[in-house]
Amino acid sequence: MKKTALTIITIASGSLGAVYFLPSEPAVQKDIRATSQHDTSVDNTSPKAFLDYSLSTLGEKPWQTITQDVVSEERALGELQLDEQLFALYLRYKQALADLDIEITGSDITSLETLHQAILDLQREYFSAQQIDLIFGEENQLRALALEKARLSEQGYSAEEQKQLWRDHLALQPEYVQESDANRRLMSELAQGEDAQTTYLKRVELVGEAGAQRLEVLDQNRAEFDRVFQHYLVQRSAILDDLGLSDEQKRQQIKMLRETSFDAKQWRRIEALERIADGG
């Protein structure tokens, strides 16, 4: 718990001195979330989760602002000594990771092992051993566990034998692996099949778990927006094609339709999309 800071005011009068201790106002924690993140909590479950959460605002916030926010959040970074150079390096790593061209063919264990090794090699290109351990240690361990699960499924064991061997293998892992939320989610994904496992591994490694979940929400929001906008265009076209309306009446009805179909903050965007739909 932080100790309350004290402001000391010393007033000297002749040979007498009086010292007053006045409690200062506690520092207000800066909200580093972007506008689109206000319905979420900052993901500081691990240094990597925090870095990925911060990077997901790129394009919405200036790079320099993101960097300053990240570097100032020492509590979320733990032992990781992060500066602007290391954060820029992390972004370059993420870009290189996205460019990895490795074909994954279903449950092919060789493909999964190739992906795992390629990720480890890429990490070594950009980071020291200590940085890799602090940033990627848990996810590397979880990915290795997923590979072990895949190997068990290819060795001819019965379903019950696989479950028992898997439990035995987990019992040998560090406590944080056995108890982590990420591990429980991984176990759920593994139980659904190898295709889900592969998707999980690639998404989490690219953007982190919180980032993957946020992208899924954004995808759903985009799909809903597209549905509403396409319906709006149909109604708008009906107004434009109505020969009984003057140009001014059409303009007013379309304006009313736009304002009742979308939030005020979207109106300028809708007008721009209308121009695109009209061919310019």
UniProtKB/Swiss-Prot annotation:
One Pfam family cited in the UniProt record for this chain: Lipase_chap
Xref: InterPro entries: Lipase_chaperone (IPR004961)
GO BP terms: lipid catabolic process; protein folding
Keyword Nucleotidyltransferase attached: no
Keywords: Cell inner membrane, Cell membrane, Chaperone, Lipid degradation, Lipid metabolism, Membrane, Transmembrane, Transmembrane helix
GO cellular component annotations of the record: plasma membrane
Locations listed in the record: Cell inner membrane
NCBIfam families per UniProt: PRK01294.1-5
Role description: May be involved in the folding of the extracellular lipase during its passage through the periplasm.
Family under the similarity heading: Belongs to the lipase chaperone family.
Name of the featured protein: Lipase chaperone
Organism for this UniProt entry: Vibrio vulnificus (strain YJ016)
Gene behind the chain: lifO
